Amino acid sequence: INSFHNMMDEINRLIDEVYVNKIALKEYELKALQAQINPHFLYNTLSMMNWMAIRSNQMEISKVTLALSTFYRTALSKGEDVVTVENCIQNMQAYLEIQLTMHDNNFTVDWDIDPTIKNEKMPKLLLQPVVENAIEHGIDEKEDGDKKIFLSFRGNGDDVVITVRDNGMGMPQEKAETLVTYQAKGYGLKNVNDRIRILYGENYGIRILSAPDEGTTVMMRFPKEGRKDEV
């Protein structure tokens, strides 16, 4: 688990460096990180850990190990910077499996997936900061009642719309709107918005709706394959 958090911290740190130094997107931080990881060694190690857990009848450990293996496989994605929506879904399913274990299953996750968009393309690891925010700044701060996260992957005309909604603490709408324009510590949503807009144009990006004690909704929009704004 610590290795997982360290990897995500390193990814987020390197994304910041990319924007500061104006490095081309195709050469951004994941290339450097992937060069340090031997996928075969990683997968073989996780496979061995899974076998040892099953042999010891530690099925919870086996479940987390398999989720971690899926997370790394979909995150590294054979060095590709652009992946399918299906890859993103698998990555988030594994990520949330790990988070649920870490949180003693004290929240639930609902999915709404349009199967017709699974082969559409998108930048990899685009959604992880959004879901992480829903957990850390949403449901983790909610003291009472059921804690829920909802993820939707839908087609909308020529676009793909991904929605992440939590029923956590929420925030004033004015603050929510600043998260996509200013680099707020611990959120990372500006980087997500910038990546989408640089790749696809200013008509795309993320929108946040929130209110105190009513949760937060983040909607991410990008074009289906082959479509983008004219520059």
Kindly label every feature range from the protein language model.
Residues K224-V231:
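Generic C-terminal helix-cap and adjacent flexible tail
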Residues I1-I37, F41-L209, G215-R221:
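Two-component histidine phosphotransfer core
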